[in-house]
């Protein structure tokens, strides 16, 4: 069995995960030279141009006609969109781990950040001079150079008051503030940029930049999850206390008026109730887990069906492992242990299945010896292994697991 601790992270030798999270994460940018050499050669520019034209892909084509004339075109893109291009342009493809499990496995190099914060891997191709302008993002990102070279400038912190160029189809601005980074990234280099920090990348030649994006849920995500929890109540979760009418003091007022003090009183009663309700604590935990394990993009799976005997045969070979498919968002909560995959709570797992998925979500790769040991600890090892192999087939078919 290979555990998470054996994975080599993409940080410099002198920066441990603890140091990075303390001194850099959401505080300041960091250049990591040759931090991810494994990405070099996985894609070439033509691969991305062709992929962007796939009808199932989420892509954007940004054309720069002048400093004040930017146009963006959204998927579906076709070959016609790539004809008569201006000198400066870029094409961006989202959710690239959907199309390359090998690329998706590189998420493990960022395992010092919990996977519930992962968004997706985006790739940007641009010829010399191509860019998407000076901008900032609402999420943290590791920009990895996979092909060619790109010059990156990182400047000021931005917020809701940051002014954008008017009449443009993308959110860009002119004022980068004082530059804190002005570097050319080579293949394999990484640039970490915190959320809301101005940055500007320009292709030095034909280049591919891969963005490993990380983000948090917003309040609307959580409120939506809580609402669904009330609508589809867990039979083990007693939410009847929330069905009781609110008791409000009454003051004289017009017949048709809903007074502000009544609204504020209801708000305070609600907040007090939420703060002292074990049932709501459980519901909120479920809502958070569901929100952060949900994918932004539709999951595409193969039509081919996995065979349990074939899975057994492969896993019995030396060097074969079961691991998480990083195209899936897999996580767990504790007290009690609950497993979530792509926004769903998996509430019908047995003990062995829960243990396997928990370890996969922690970045471990499991071999046949480990899986057999789990089954051998049960009263009926043969039946337990047969059930586990059936489940592994379902996980592979659903895009949750890989057999390597």
From Swiss-Prot:
Top-rank taxon: Bacteria
Domain JmjC: 102-231
EC number: 1.14.11.-
Residues that, per the record, bind Fe cation: 135, 137, 199
Protein name in the entry: Probable ribosomal oxygenase HI_0396
Source lineage: Bacteria, Pseudomonadati, Pseudomonadota, Gammaproteobacteria, Pasteurellales
PANTHER family: MINA53 MYC INDUCED NUCLEAR ANTIGEN (PTHR13096), RIBOSOMAL OXYGENASE 1 (PTHR13096:SF8)
Family affiliation: Belongs to the ROX family.
Keywords recorded for this protein, A-Z: Dioxygenase, Iron, Metal-binding, Oxidoreductase
